[in-house]
Each structure stands twice: as structure tokens, then as C-alpha cells.
Swiss-Prot record:
GO biological process: viral genome replication
InterPro entries listed in its UniProt record: Rotavirus_A/C_NSP5
Modified residues (Phosphoserine): 67, 153, 155, 163, 165
GO molecular function, one term: RNA binding
UniProt feature, compositional bias: Acidic residues: 152-165
Keyword Oxidoreductase: no
Region (Homodimerization and interaction with NSP6): 188-197
Name of the protein in its database record: Non-structural protein 5
GO cellular component, one term: host cell cytoplasm
Species assigned in the record: Rotavirus A (strain RVA/Pig/Mexico/YM/1983/G11P9[7]) (RV-A)
Pfam families registered for this protein in UniProt: Rota_NS26
Keyword terms: Glycoprotein, Host cytoplasm, Magnesium, Metal-binding, Nucleotide-binding, Phosphoprotein, RNA-binding
Cofactor: Mg(2+)
Purpose of the protein: Plays an essential role in the viral genome replication. Participates, together with NSP2, in the formation of viral factories (viroplasms), which are large inclusions in the host cytoplasm where replication intermediates are assembled and viral RNA replication takes place. Orchestrates the recruitment of viroplasmic proteins such as capsid proteins to these factories. Participates in the selective exclusion of host proteins from stress granules (SG) and P bodies (PB). Also participates in the sequestration of these remodeled organelles in viral factories.
Amino acid sequence: MSLSIDVTSLPSISSSIFKNESSSTTSTLSGKSIGRSEQYISPDAEAFNKYMLSKSPEDIGPSDSASNDPLTSFSIRSNAVKTNADAGVSMDSSTQSRPSSNVGCDQVDFSLTKGINVSANLDSCISISTDHKKEKSKKDKSRKHYPRIEADSDSEDYVLDDSDSDDGKCKNCKYKKKYFALRMRMKQVAMQLIEDL
């Protein structure tokens, strides 16, 4: 797993990553030991250009400036003037060269030594228990206990009162006895169903 971070806007971080311990007075470039005063500190821009043109393209590394922009060369020389050679601060003696593939973009690769193990085992148990059939059979059994209603035909005419009828609609009921028996049985069935539920 690698993490790439753009540190172009952070020059202090990028310079500290590629900087190693260096010599206090000299800088090693292409096998030659050149003093810092001879390399960078030059009051004349032509001397700096001559120095860059005198080097072969193979010897020019990331620590050198191959730009012909006067502002770039001036900033390099001004930073070099501020650098004290006797203090042991060297900006170009790093044994670890900067990556030249990504121009203008410093990349830092962080390699994680510890692997991240993600356990994605989902132990899920779904148990669905339905008692629908049992309830059905129970209802069937309870219904079997109910006695059947057998109606006897009556030839007599029965007249219901208004209290027994629905809004007085049933004035002449021929089967009053059968009606009362049916109503009683329905009440018993309803009460039995309520108790079962």
C-alpha cells in the first residue's frame, strides 16, 4: 500500500526528506570536490551561465539548475549567499538524488510495514419461525367442537317485537324459534373465538 502526497507547496518538507548528512566545506558533484563559493556565490550572472554551460548534460543533476530564467538563477544565487559553507549546510551533496521523472512535483511514498487486515466475515443467522399452520389447525380443531345448528321448520307465524328486530324492519318473522337459536349459537361461537385469540 503506497500513499502519494504532493508536497510542491511545502519546500521545507521536500528538502528535508531528500537531505542527508553532508560535508561541511565541499560538495561532491560528478566526482569533483568543488567549494560552495566556487559553485554558487558569483556576483556576475555570466559566470553562472558559463559554469552551467561548461558541464556536460550527463553531469547536470537535480541539484543543479538548468534553467535559463534569470529569476530562477537569481533566487538560487541569493539562497546560496545566505548559506554559510563553514556551517556544514549543503544543499547539493545528497547521495539520494531527487526523482527526475516528475518535474515540478515532489512525491513522497510512504510504505506501510504493518498490513491492515480487515475481517469481513459476516456470521448472520436468520431463523424465521411461523406458526401459521399450527394456528390454522388449532382453529380447525376448535371449530370442530362447535355443534351444528339444525333448523326445524315451523309452520306457525311469529311476530317479533321492535326490541328484537333490527330497527323494527322484521315485523313478520316466520322462523322466530330458529332465529333465536341461531343467534344464541353465533354468540357462543363469537365468545369462543375471542377466548381463543
